[in-house]
Amino acid sequence: MPGVTKEEPQLDLAIIGGGITGLSLAAGLLSRNIHVTIYERARQFREIGAGIGFTPNAERSMIALDPRVHAAFKNVATPNETDLFRWVDGYTHYSDERYEELLFETDLGKRGFEGCHRAQFLDELVKLIPEKNVRLGKTLRRVTEKVDGEKLLLEFEDGSTAEADAVIGCDGIRSRVRQLILGEDNPASYPRYSHKSAFRGLVPMDRAVDAMGREKALTRHMHLGQDAHVLTFPVAMGKLLNVVAFVTDPGEWPHEEKLSAPASKEEAVQAFSGFGHVVRAVMDLLPDTLDRWAVFDTYDHPASTYVRGRMCIAGDAAHASSPHHGAGAGTGIEDAAVLAAVLAAASETASSLAKTKAEALRAALATYDAIRLERSQWVVQSSRILGELYEWQYEPTGRDAAKCGAEVYWRSHQIWDYDVDDMLRRTAEDYRRRLE
C-alpha cells in the first residue's frame, strides 16, 4: 500500500491526544503526505508513569508505521542484560537472601522486549512533529458533521473550533472521542477498576544490584506471589530499575476522577511484608513518596466498535488494557500502523476521484475496525488473566509452575509472534473490497 506522492495533501485529519499512540500515528501520517493536526488538552506533552516496554510485534509495527518512530524508541531503549524474561517465586522465604526459585523463562529474541522511560520516548516522538501541526490546551467537547457533509466540525471547551476530514481519538483511557462514538450513556464509554493497583517507582541501579544481584537487576523479572506480584526491569540505559508492585484490592478505587494517588514507601513495604527477601529488599529501596496507580481497563464493557462514520478511536481510547502483558502501548502502535496504511490508501482514492473523501474515509475506518477490534480486545482479556495467574488466583493454573509457564508462553507468543505484514496485507484487501 504505497504512500502518495509529495503533492498537495488530499486529507486533513485531526488526532485528539498527544500521547505515544497519537504522536506515533501523526508521524506515520505526515510521512505519507497526509496533513494532520494534534489537539492535546495539556499545555505541554507529557506521559504519566515511569517505565514502558515494547514487545517484538510492536517494534515491527513501528517500522511499518514509520522507521523514525522505531529509531526514536531505540534511541532511549535500555537493553536487558540477557534476552530472557524470567518468572520467579517472589513469595517463598529462602535462606539465600538473593535467591528466588526460577519457575519458568522464555527467550525474547535479540534485544526483544526492551524498556524505556516513557517521558524520554515521548520527547523523541515530539521531535518528529512540526510545531505547526500541534495545538496544545485543547479539550474536545463535541464533533458534528457540517451541513455540506464534507468536513467535521470540532468544538473545544475554550470555545474555539476546527475542521477536519476525519477525527482519530488517541485521547487515552478516559477518551472523550470514545464517548462520542459509543454514547455518553453507554457503559462501554468508560473504563472500570480491575481491582488491582500498583506502587510504581524507580530505584538507582547500583542499589538494586546490591539487593538483587547484577544479573537479576539487569534482566526483566516477574516476581510471583499470593494476591500480589512485582515486575522489575532496567530503564534509563541501565542506570535505574523500574519497579511496578501490584496488589489485589477487592474494594473500589476511592479517588474518583484520579487514576493515581500519593502513597508512601511504608504502604508498599507493608503490602509485601509477607513476601521473600528479594521483594522486601526492593520495596525498601523505593523512594519515600510514591504514586499508587489504579489499574483500570475496558474488560468489563468492551466497545462494540471503534468507529462511527469518520470518527475512530485507537490505543487506550479504544482498548485500554491492564499492563500484565506489557502490550498495551504496543497494541496502540499496531492500530497506528493499520490506520496509517489504510488512510494512505484512502488519500489515493480521493486523489483519483474514484470516491469522495468522505466515502473513502468511511471505508478506510470500517477496514480499521474490522482488522483491529478482535485482536486488541483479546489482549485486554488475556492481560486480565495474566494478572490473576501471577498472583496464583487463576484456577486453571494455581501455583503449578509448569501450567503457569505453558499458559504464559502461549499467551505471550500470541502477541509477540503476530504477523504484522499479514495484518497490513489483510488491511489492503479489506479496503479494496469495500470500494467495489
Swiss-Prot record:
Disruption phenotype: Impairs the production of azaphilone pigments (MonAzPs) but accumulates the benzaldehyde 6-(4-hydroxy-2-oxopentyl)-3-methyl-2,4-dioxocyclohexane carbaldehyde, also known as M7PKS-1. The keyword Manganese does not apply. Induction: Expression is positively regulated by the azaphilone pigments (MonAzPs) gene cluster-specific transcription regulator pigB. GO terms for biological process: secondary metabolite biosynthetic process. As colorants, MonAzPs are widely used in various food products for centuries. Moreover, MonAzPs also possess wide-ranging biological activities such as antibacterial activity, preventing hypertension, lowering cholesterol levels, causing hypolipidemic effects, and displaying antiobesity and antitumor activities. Pathway: Secondary metabolite biosynthesis. Keywords: FAD, Flavoprotein, Monooxygenase, Oxidoreductase, Pigment. FAD binds at residues 40, 53, 118, 316, 329. Its EC number is 1.-.-.-. The active site is at 200. It comes from the Eukaryota. GO terms for molecular function: FAD binding; phenylalanine 2-monooxygenase activity; pigment binding. Gene3D superfamilies: FAD/NAD(P)-binding domain (3.50.50.60). Its cofactor is FAD. InterPro entries: FAD-bd, FAD/NAD-bd_sf, FAD_monoxygenase. FAD-dependent monooxygenase; part of the gene cluster that mediates the biosynthesis of azaphilone pigments (MonAzPs), a complex mixture of compounds with a common azaphilone skeleton very widely used as food colorants. The first step of the pathway is performed by the nrPKS pigA that forms the hexaketide precursor from successive condensations of five malonyl-CoA units, with a simple acetyl-CoA starter unit. Belongs to the paxM FAD-dependent monooxygenase family. This is FAD-dependent monooxygenase pigN. The gene is pigN.
